[in-house]
């Protein structure tokens, strides 16, 4: 009976997000800026904290980072991400554990002038209150995610535009 209940709760708490961003910057620049995780707080207001578990400057396979994110609504999520696979200028995937459990996948497609980034985020919340509130709070969780992504993309684009105007 408990297994059935857990399966039901898991299905109600599965979130699949698929976001596509078009960046007016060359693929190489977009890739390098996005992998420079230490600079994320400068352009991503929703990122409260990010720190490596180990010594590294740019993300590569096996790296482990901890982060805390807070959107518009009065809660934050903390999770660890471990880089699972990386193909330079093309693909990045990672697993997350903590307040969220799941995976993120980024595909990059670009040219000398622009970059398309497709970000897939498949996660389950692990916080009990989030799991129990899913039947009525799901739209708020989705909206919060969308607002965080919108702000992050806007901040990333502004940062790229500023660097390219210098």
Protein language model features and the residues they cover:
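Hydrophobic ligand-binding cavity/cleft-lining segments
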Residues: 1-60, 166
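A short, structured loop/turn motif at beta-sheet edges
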Residues: 27-28, 55-59, 84-89, 107-116
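Hydrophobic pocket/interface hotspot
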Residues: 30-34, 40, 65, 83, ...
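Hydrophobic beta-strand positions in extracellular immunoglobulin-like domains
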Residues: 23, 69, 121-123
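Beta-strand/loop substructures that line and gate deep hydrophobic ligand-binding cavities in soluble
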Residues: 96-150
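Glycine-rich portal/gate segments that line the openings of hydrophobic small-molecule binding cavities
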Residues: 51-100, 151-166
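Hydrophobic/aromatic beta-strand elements that line small-molecule binding cavities or substrate pockets
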Residues: 19-21, 79-85, 103-110, 121
